[in-house]
Every structure is written in C-alpha cells, then in structure tokens.
Amino acid sequence: MNREEVQLLGFEIVAFAGDARSKFLEALTAAQAGDFAKADALIEEGNNCIAEAHRAQTSLLAKEAQGDDIAYSVTMMHGQDHLMTTILLKDLMKHLLEFYKRG
C-alpha cells in the first residue's frame, strides 16, 4: 500500500471519528436537556460513524496481515488517535447518560 492510499484511509478515519465525536457531544447536550430519545438517536448515528471508521482501519490491518508493505503516514496516526479518543468518549457517554437519567 503506497503512502497516498494510507493517507486516504487516515483521512477517512479522521472524518468518521470526528463525525462520531460530534454526534456523541450533541447527544450529551440533548441528555442534559432531558431529551433522551434524541440523545439515543444521536448515539446511534455516532455508532454508525465509528463502524465506518473501523471499516477503514480494518482494511488497512487486513492488508498488513496479508504481507503488504504499509507506508508510514502521520495522517493515519492522527486518524488512529481520533478514533481512540472517540471510542473513549463513547464509553464515557454510557455512564454520563445514566447520571442524567437518574436526575
């Protein structure tokens, strides 16, 4: 896989992880306002974005596992960082929503 291909996957991961992060933060705002149906819908949208980011990540991992030489890319590293922090936010959202639901 050449550098450009790896960078494109990195940009995909950044974009999807960024969209997921935005959805999760919107969900938190909705929960703060007591609109849990909206929060749940936004979390589902965020989860779909995470799934797309994972799809891009998995395609890269599969190519490496098949023996392809993967070019180093700061863009890909940046994408991985975005994905990791967004997944952490997703995990924390579960606990935060419980606090808001309890009142």
Curated annotation (Swiss-Prot):
* Any single GO CC term annotated in Swiss-Prot or TrEMBL for this entry: cytoplasm
State one molecular function term (GO): metal ion binding
Q: Return the domain comment text from this UniProt entry.
A: The PTS EIIA type-3 domain is phosphorylated by phospho-HPr on a histidyl residue. Then, it transfers the phosphoryl group to the PTS EIIB type-3 domain.
Annotated residues that bind Mg(2+) are located at: 81
Cofactor comment text: Binds 1 Mg(2+) ion per trimer.
Q: Name one GO biological process term.
A: phosphoenolpyruvate-dependent sugar phosphotransferase system
Q: What residues does the PTS EIIA type-3 domain cover?
A: 4-102
Q: Which CDD domains match?
A: PTS_IIA_lac
CC cofactor: Mg(2+)
Residues recorded with modification Phosphohistidine:
78
What is the originating organism of this protein? Staphylococcus aureus
Induction / repression: Induced by lactose, galactose and galactose-6-P. Repressed by glucose.
Main subcellular localisation = cytoplasm
Name of the protein described by the UniProt record:
PTS system lactose-specific EIIA component
Q: Which NCBIfam families match?
A: EIIA-LAC (TIGR00823)
Which superkingdom does the taxonomy of this entry point to?
Bacteria
Provide the taxonomic classification. Answer: Bacteria, Bacillati, Bacillota, Bacilli, Bacillales
